[in-house]
Amino acid sequence: MHFFATDAWSQGVHHYLEHFPQCPKGRAADSELAFAVDATPAYLRKPIVATRLRDVYPSVALPHLRFVVILRDPVERLHAYWDTFVQAGVGVNDFKKWVDTTLEKVKTCQKAHGPELWPPPDTGRCDPEVIEGVAAGLYAYQLAYWFKQFTPARFLITSLDAYERAAGAVLRDVSGFIGVSAALLGTAREIGTPSDAQVVKVMGAPPPAAKEALGKFYHPHNAHLHKFLEGQPHAHCSPNLAGLGIGSWAEG
């Protein structure tokens, strides 16, 4: 429902809570109903979400929040973004043409505001939709911000690649991280097999020329992400840092 990231916020926290079952008092952690999850691709890239979380949750609850972050190759993510959200304009039916136009807009924005694109500049001199779409794949900057808000130990970082390759290990790591038994969380077959990850993928791969251009753009950012996570011993990577697959992204 994207409550913390959209105008749904104006409807108040009671509207948000109506979407979740009440948590009965005294129920054990491994009982039939022990927790609920708010999952959305919007929260990580929206700085205001962290502020709103602090506004909603009482101070005694904040230390108990846990964040599971699922990353994706930013080239594949942007391809899916184009397929879902680009409904008009240059390149609406041609991803390579859209990429060329988009990267030109990115260069123009960087000339005006410097190389960093996240958080997206809010000055009216950059195309907000284009910049936000591209900047959503700059994960290191986003994670650095969130780690300052809630500390690295409260984050488990995994990826779509990791889930496809080692679903069982990822599910075990997630269940241990949030403090429930693996049986309560469910098996990979019950939750969604690795093959089910295909539902979030665009039919067909990005054209080679578009993939190469985006790979060159994201290459230093992916390498920065890998180095950043290497320096975060308290953050949890599942199944491990190498298993996230960032190395293959950084190859461009």
Feature-to-residue mapping (PLM):
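PAPS-dependent sulfotransferase catalytic core
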Residues: 1-43, 61-65, 75-113
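Aromatic-acidic/polar surface patches that form glycan- and anion
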Residues: 5, 9, 30, 42-46, ...
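Generic structural signal for well-ordered alpha-helices
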Residues: 13-20, 50, 54, 143-144, ...
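N-terminal cationic-hydrophobic initiation segments that often serve targeting/anchoring roles
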Residues: 17, 24, 28, 54-58, ...
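A cross-domain feature marking catalytic cores of carbohydrate-active enzymes
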Residues: 39-41, 69-71, 207
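PAPS-dependent sulfotransferase catalytic domain
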Residues: 49-51, 64-69, 76-173, 177-178, ...
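The conserved 3'-phosphoadenosine-5'-phosphosulfate
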Residues: 72, 123-124, 132, 144-224, ...
